[in-house]
C-alpha cells in the first residue's frame, strides 16, 4: 500500500496560476480603458474651434498664474513661458 501524495502543493500551484492570470487580465482591462479615454479626448481635441484656431489638446498644457491667496492681487507675477518656449528649450 503506497502512500498518496498530498494534494496541497497542486492546489496551491493552481491557485497561484489563477491569481497571476487574474492580475494580468485586470491590468489588460485597465490599460484598454485608459487607452479608450485618451482616444476620446484626442478625437475631441482634433475638432477645430469656431474661431478657426486649433482645438483643445490634452497633450499640451498651458499655465497661467492668476491672483491667489498666496500671491495676492498686489504682488504681480512674472510672465510664465509659453508652451512654444518649452518645446524650443527641449
UniProtKB/Swiss-Prot annotation:
Biological process (GO), any one: regulation of skeletal muscle tissue regeneration
TM region(s), chain numbering: 19-39
InterPro entries, per the entry: SPAR (IPR054161)
A Gene Ontology cellular-component term: late endosome membrane
Lumenal side: 1-18
Locations listed in the record: Late endosome membrane; Lysosome membrane
Parts of the chain on the Cytoplasmic side: 40-90
Keyword Transmembrane helix recorded: yes
Source domain of life: Eukaryota
Subunit structure: Interacts with components of the lysosomal V-ATPase complex. Interacts with ATP6V0A1. Interacts with ATP6V0A2.
Protein name (Swiss-Prot/TrEMBL): Small regulatory polypeptide of amino acid response
Species per Swiss-Prot/TrEMBL record: Homo sapiens (Human)
Gene designation per UniProt: SPAAR
Amino acid at each position: 500500500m503506497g502512500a498518496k501524495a498530498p494534494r496541497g502543493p497542486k492546489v496551491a500551484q493552481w491557485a497561484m496560476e489563477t491569481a497571476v492570470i487574474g492580475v494580468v487580465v485586470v491590468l489588460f482591462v485597465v490599460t484598454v480603458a485608459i487607452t479608450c479615454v485618451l482616444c476620446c479626448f484626442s478625437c475631441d481635441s482634433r475638432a477645430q474651434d469656431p474661431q478657426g484656431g486649433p482645438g483643445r489638446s490634452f497633450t499640451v498644457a498651458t499655465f497661467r498664474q492668476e491672483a491667489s491667496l498666496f500671491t495676492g492681487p498686489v504682488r504681480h507675477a512674472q510672465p510664465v513661458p509659453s508652451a512654444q518656449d518649452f518645446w524650443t528649450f527641449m
